[in-house]
């Protein structure tokens, strides 16, 4: 029997919400015919054009060099408390991200015998006196935790090196993926800070060649946006992403993770693991994603 284009489209539409056997039953076709249509469509395997667009450039060993470690900051009298001022200076040294200086700073901090909680109380009291209100004292939380600061500083330095190794002088230029988002949503007006989700979905779905075909594609793109933000943020605390990029990221998370059926248990498990690790796990849209994974 020769299949019509309408039958093929019906099979593809049904497959997005049903198993292969259910599609065969609903479409009145043999399981073999359904599998053939799905395979030939290419819509249920990873989209190579999508992957190419949403992939960071490779690390270049011969790329730009990391900015030199800043000179040691001068030791200054800030609070008048010698131990507190010493810690403030050591925190600046650790903030350079240089492993050698960090090790030296932590060694020097070990010679301060006052308990860390006492140091934080004294620093908090000074902050309150300077700021004129109790909330100012919150700035002392974790003040004496040099190990945590050292870990963050080393991670930031590593991210800076990766950012320069991948992008060089083009770090702040819009990537192809960002340019695509800007162009796709050009002319849309925001409503209460965000673009209307329905119109965002319509605009992006108008470019099927750059749509994710699988949940794995979705996870790949979400990781791309996370990594791009991580690398740029390490180089500038003032960096923030385009509103259009944020809308694309939301669209992939809230819409596509809920629409694209998992191809197998491994893909469903990977998506669930992403949800559990995500800061968005409490969003109301997560229920639809869970229904998609276990439905």
Task: Identify the meaning behind each predicted range.
Residues 22-25:
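Short alpha-helical "recognition helix" segments of helix-turn-helix
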Residues 93, 99-233:
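Long amphipathic alpha-helical segments with strong coiled-coil/leucine-zipper propensity
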Residues 222, 243-257:
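Short amphipathic alpha-helical coiled-coil/interface segments
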Residues 233-243, 261-262:
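Charged, low-complexity interaction regions
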